[in-house]
Amino acid sequence: MKRKNIALIPAAGIGVRFGADKPKQYVEIGSKTVLEHVLGIFERHEAVDLTVVVVSPEDTFADKVQTAFPQVRVWKNGGQTRAETVRNGVAKLLETGLAAETDNILVHDAARCCLPSEALTRLIEQAGNAAEGGILAVPVADTLKRAESGQISATVDRSGLWQAQTPQLFQAGLLHRALAAENLDGITDEASAVEKLGVRPLLIQGDARNLKLTQPQDAYIVRLLLNAV
């Protein structure tokens, strides 16, 4: 039986560092919000069977998303952290029968709206049948410095270091178990949760264009990338 590929977009964050008057996933770039750009990527991809967005219970912007993408499931059961939001989304997928334990969940940042289709294809093709799952990532290119009191304390050897991106693909059952802990402190992405179970996810070559909208100046680069598509 073919595994389903389900995109899960945690969008309950408020994006404090971005400094806008609304959560950054709802900032408009061009004629669409960041989140709408993200959803378009998954809705256009032939290998993605279902897309789910998990937002905060207090979210007042999600209705516009639902109107623009009526086929997307928008659930208002987000948590206080990304890990809690993903946990709640995966749990509901399993409880409702929309996902089986062996189906693939592709967790993607709501602020990464320039994900190239070919990178998504590569992740699904190379990690979609792997029990350990996998994530998009790129080798660290810049020299890394360790800081202490505003000064360099050491230069970090970057050999073997990769910068994690999203989507991060794992079977629903594995991801559910990985996020079942009551205390999710220190879980910054799905791979880190899975690693705590002793699983070693695959690293799949990502793409430099798949940047995360974090600081206000990132919006300029994102506009250029979206206009180039």
Swiss-Prot record:
Keyword Zinc: no
Molecular function as annotated in GO: 2-C-methyl-D-erythritol 4-phosphate cytidylyltransferase activity
Gene3D superfamilies per the UniProt record, alphabetical: Spore Coat Polysaccharide Biosynthesis Protein SpsA, Chain A
Site-annotated residues for Transition state stabilizer: R17, K24
Pathway involvement of the protein, from the record: Isoprenoid biosynthesis; isopentenyl diphosphate biosynthesis via DXP pathway; isopentenyl diphosphate from 1-deoxy-D-xylulose 5-phosphate: step 2/6
Keywords: Isoprene biosynthesis, Nucleotidyltransferase, Transferase
Its biological purpose: Catalyzes the formation of 4-diphosphocytidyl-2-C-methyl-D-erythritol from CTP and 2-C-methyl-D-erythritol 4-phosphate (MEP).
Protein name, entry field: 2-C-methyl-D-erythritol 4-phosphate cytidylyltransferase
Organism: Neisseria gonorrhoeae (strain NCCP11945)
